[in-house]
Amino acid sequence: MKTDIQTELTQALLSHEKVWANEEKTILAKNILLDLVEKTDPTIIGLLLGNDDLKRHFFVEVNGVLVFKLQDFRFFLDKHSINNSYTKYANRIGLTDGNRFLKDSSDIVLDFPFKDCVLNGGQSTEEGEEIYFKRNNSQSVSQSVSQSVSQSVSQSVSQSVSQSVSQSVSQSVSQSVSQLYTKLTRKRQEIFFNQTLAFDEIDRLFDAKAFSKFSRYTADGKQAVGEIKRHSDGTPAENLIIKGNNLIALHSLAKQFKGKVKLIYIDPPYNTGNDGFKYNDKFNHSTWLTFMKNRLEIAKTLLADDGVIFVQCDDIEQAYLKILMDDIFDRDNFLNIVTVKTKIGGVSGSSEGKSLKDSTEFINVFSKNRERLFLNPVYQKTEVNEFIKNYEDSGKSWKYTQVLIDLGEKILLEEKDGFKYYHYPNAQMTSIVKFSQDQNLSKEIIYTEYSHKVYRTTNAQSSIRSKIIEDLYSIKNGIVSIEYIPQKGKNAGNLIEVFYNASNKDMFMFLSDMLIKEKNKYFYLQKVNTLWDDIQYNNLNKEGGYIDFKNGKKPEALLRRIIDMTTKEGDIVLDYHLGSGTTAAVAHKMNRQYIGIEQMDYIETLAVERLKKVIDGEQGGISKAVNWQGGGEFVYAELAPFNETAKQQILACEDSDDIKTLFEDLCERYFLKYNVSVKEFSQIIEEPEFQSLPLDEQKQMVLEMLDLNQMYVSLSEMDDEQFAGCLNDDDKALSRAFYQAEKKDGE
């Protein structure tokens, strides 16, 4: 039933076209209305002032001036909207003309209607589907259902118990119940907490949370945690693996790691329904974007000023994700989109003939502050003769075609300002073709065994070449060189000699400088570009000590490249979609500090077990390449659960009696949504119709009553009597130590 104020507000806004979600003007577009009042839209404010009741309710006079009570208006809209924490525009992204969604308009402008929302993202079911119920209020329907259920139950008792009879009774009961409850199915509806509403709830949602179940894992096994180790600047120095909702965990970590993380890599659920992770990977389009937005916003605050974030995605949401990240990190801080060639995924069934085979994924790369960013040079490697063949097959001319046979006599010409100039008047040079003929060697052998003699020349401009041209202008025969110690670059601090053709002063570049030798093979090194097609995505089963995670694993080589490019030893790496633990495992092997967050139960069977094997020295993945010998440690902890515990208890119920008993406990011990009618449900739970519903459907109805704001225990409330049993004294002490919080008097 509408309140008087609701009615007055509805009437007052009828003349304003923008604030209605439907043509009938029966549903207010709450987000649009709030956006307008926050901008102090003169038309809206005028309409509110024009109604005496609304004026009295939402304005206060201060020194003769009427001041709009924005907070009160927000709270009013929240309190009187459908389901309170749900919005009228739930699970929908729109293309708008500024007033209406695309389906109502022919003009197109991309818009995210949930830009002011927070998606909690309770990822507890793999299928991403939920069932909800709409009760039919007709008394005649209720009587009919009761009679039908009674008859069905009587018949089932009198007949012999057989499968066919049981199925018949079940069908009869279900059909009867369906007359009383309309059963509806939808993609799982994520809960939105609108930031412009119910600020007390939002503050509680993002409060620092207490931790429980601390454990330290070392080469000696699992141990108790005695302290939280710290760097000299006070930042925790522990490798951390945290179980819990990643949005809540990120807000908690921000209290200690704000501006400290050098690299964030995430491989989130792709919104395809095909991901191996047990997330709700069937998010509605806007739900997925909001899910990403909320986490990216808080993750940005953790990044160091010279930090960088890599977000991997497939082509389903790539375009939208890029726009979202442009908004959060600023387009000026966009670096690249890296295309990663993965194993080829086939198309079959209904997709056959309707799409191309999917063989790539994309990584969006953004910096926190592009002006402060420096990416370390990282190289792709290809067997040298294979590289040359591919290079020539592409129609390009291979440049390394000369051989320096012998330098001959070395004459010091001059020494000044830390530079030595030399002349090699008798240097012998020839083409690689003639050298091959004279030495009876194949080009393949020359390119490998004689790579230190194979060269090309270049006229690339540099300050050193300018010195050569100026100081040795008169010398035109043989080779000249300059010897010095560079102050920066890859050879900084080392004595080097650079050679030039005396006639034109072009610089010598030797093939050996572009090669690396591994296991008696020579590989050509090429700076990585935005196409990464050299990383093996197949046969990952041996990585991580045979950790089984079929569709979720990323190659350790992929993470090594990203970590090499963006960090140095000791830097902090964060992955808040940890999954099988690849990021943490690679960071551990590369001596980086890391934080991994995962809320699914498999964190203990996958990520933790994988890291234990890393400590033991497992030799899969990048281990041999980085000479990993084992060692190190990490700390495991969980966000201390409260309503999360209630959720697990609901899921563990075995029959209706368990649910009934538990519901009484829920009302006394746990937080339920403030709009839940406990009295009404206490009556419903006694009805035969409800008890005849499938057990999973009964559980679902109870689960939806839990207040998601209270899934975990806040640090500030962990000593409250209501949370007794959620944490022990050691948990509380370590939680305080983590946040560097003082124990209050009397605690």
Swiss-Prot record:
EC number: 2.1.1.72
PROSITE patterns per the UniProt record, alphabetical: N6_MTASE
InterPro entries the UniProt entry points to: DNA_methylase_N4/N6, DNA_methylase_N6_adenine_CS, N4/N6-MTase_EcoPI_Mod-like, RM_Methyltransferase, SAM-dependent_MTases_sf, TypeIII_RM_meth
Keyword annotations: DNA-binding, Methyltransferase, Restriction system, S-adenosyl-L-methionine, Transferase
One Pfam family from the record: TypeIII_RM_meth
Transmembrane helix found in the keyword field: no
Region (Binding of S-adenosyl methionine): 267-270
Enzyme class: transferase
Sample GO molecular function, one term: N-methyltransferase activity
Gene3D superfamilies, A to Z: Vaccinia Virus protein VP39
Reaction it catalyzes: a 2'-deoxyadenosine in DNA + S-adenosyl-L-methionine = an N(6)-methyl-2'-deoxyadenosine in DNA + S-adenosyl-L-homocysteine + H(+)
Domain of life per record: Bacteria
GO BP annotations, alphabetical order: DNA restriction-modification system; methylation
Subunit structure: Homodimer, also forms a functional restriction-competent complex with Res.
Family membership: Belongs to the N(4)/N(6)-methyltransferase family.
Alphabetical list of PANTHER family matching this protein: 4FE-4S FERREDOXIN-TYPE DOMAIN-CONTAINING PROTEIN, PROTEIN CBG11839-RELATED
Job of this protein: DNA restriction requires both the Res and Mod subunits.
Protein name: Probable type III restriction-modification enzyme HindVI Mod subunit
Species of origin: Haemophilus influenzae (strain ATCC 51907 / DSM 11121 / KW20 / Rd)
Lineage: Bacteria, Pseudomonadati, Pseudomonadota, Gammaproteobacteria, Pasteurellales
